[in-house]
């Protein structure tokens, strides 16, 4: 019997690797001779680098980059085991958590550090970059990123503009003569689970600006600046990105990756499961187990359990979900490939207690599921 264990992390509690390990422990108590394949998974957001590195026997590369406020910060990216693919999280270099709440101002914050991460990855000779762009602190249209990669964003006098979304209204022309030539030889895939355009009522500034510290006045200024930026890109690069779905992701980073890197914007879970070769792994499985911190009606929107289930159902495999908690509307997940779902919580308790006992609760839940499966085999 082959059992594939492919969970996401339980946010603020357990990594995907730890969840998978505890599920295996529980099942081994009942099925000691089964073949277990543990495959930590992520949806393109937090934890993606660690999950992809673990699954490909790769490594983490620690680097110093320019933070959102222009200071020097510690960041990281991942390399696959064959060192042909880089795994990058924008949040590691240009994330909201890098900026204290009282200093959040998207007129000033820059994505320059994300460009430095990409440049470091190219220095390692990668042929493929997978970039997660969630959790950003910026609204600069990815301008900082492309500046780090060699593009010159020039004002009317021919001087380079500064950092931050507030500088984009000064942009007069774009010179890509010194843009890193290695970009053309690298395939860029962007984990992007939003479809917002660059500008407008559903654009980057209006929808995501407030969480980055933007006031109503800033939102209007930033939206106008991004519109101007898009017009210069259209004129100088002959590329229209303003209303492309996903262009507004991460404060317009989606637009920059499209225009300057020729990136493909895709659902994060699709990129991850494809890169991990999940199809081939589950093809001959007897059972697939997945999970995340909470399984609810939102799980069907690009989350790991449904992404894993969709792959498994291509081969008619049974799928079980194990979650920290379930909600009353969880039934909808059964229509999307999860055959059964279980919570690891056995009684009403505080969040602190639930987090403290998470590992043992996952193991015990997995053991009970395995025992139930074994009983059912005997009954049949």
Task: Set out the residue ranges of the language-model regions.
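N-terminal loops that bind phosphate or other acidic moieties
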Residues: 1-133, 137-380
């Amino acid at each position: 019997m082959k059992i594939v264990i492919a969970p996401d992390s339980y946010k603020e509690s357990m990594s995907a690797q730890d969840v998978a390990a505890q599920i295996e422990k529980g099942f081994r108590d009942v099925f000691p001779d089964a073949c277990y394949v543990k495959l930590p998974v992520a949806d393109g957001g937090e934890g993606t680098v660690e999950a992809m590195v673990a699954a490909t026997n790769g490594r983490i590369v620690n680097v110093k980059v320019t933070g959102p406020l222009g200071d020097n910060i510690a960041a990281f990216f991942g390399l696959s085991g064959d060192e042909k693919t880089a795994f990058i999280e924008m949040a590691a270099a240009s994330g909201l958590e890098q900026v204290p709440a009282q200093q959040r101002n998207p007129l000033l914050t820059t994505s320059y550090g994300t460009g430095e991460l990409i440049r470091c990855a190219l220095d390692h000779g990668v042929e493929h970059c997978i970039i997660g762009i969630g959790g950003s602190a910026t609204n600069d249209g990815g301008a900082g990123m492309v500046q780090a990669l060699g593009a010159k964003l020039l004002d009317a006098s021919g001087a380079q503009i500064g950092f931050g979304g507030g500088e984009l209204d000064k942009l007069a022309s774009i010179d890509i003569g010194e843009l890193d030539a290695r970009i053309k030889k690298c395939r860029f895939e962007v984990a992007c689970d939003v479809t917002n355009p660059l500008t407008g009522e559903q654009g980057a500034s209006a929808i995501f600006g407030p969480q980055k510290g933007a006031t109503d006045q800033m939102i209007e200024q930033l939206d106008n600046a991004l519109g101007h930026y898009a017009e210069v890109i259209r004129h100088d690069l002959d590329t229209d990105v303003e209303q492309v779905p996903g262009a507004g992701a991460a404060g317009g980073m989606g637009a920059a990756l499209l225009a300057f890197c020729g990136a493909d914007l895709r659902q994060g879970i699709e990129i991850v499961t494809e890169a991990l070769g999940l199809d081939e792994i589950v093809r001959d499985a007897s059972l697939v187990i997945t999970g995340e911190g909470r399984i609810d009606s939102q799980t069907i929107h690009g989350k790991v359990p449904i992404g894993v289930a969709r792959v498994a159902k291509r081969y008619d495999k049974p799928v079980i979900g194990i979650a920290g908690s379930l909600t009353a509307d969880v039934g909808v997940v059964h229509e999307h490939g999860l055959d059964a779902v279980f919570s690891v919580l056995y009684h009403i308790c505080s969040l602190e207690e639930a987090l403290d006992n998470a590992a043992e609760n996952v193991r015990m839940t997995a053991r009970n599921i395995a025992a139930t499966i074994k009983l059912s085999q005997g009954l049949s």
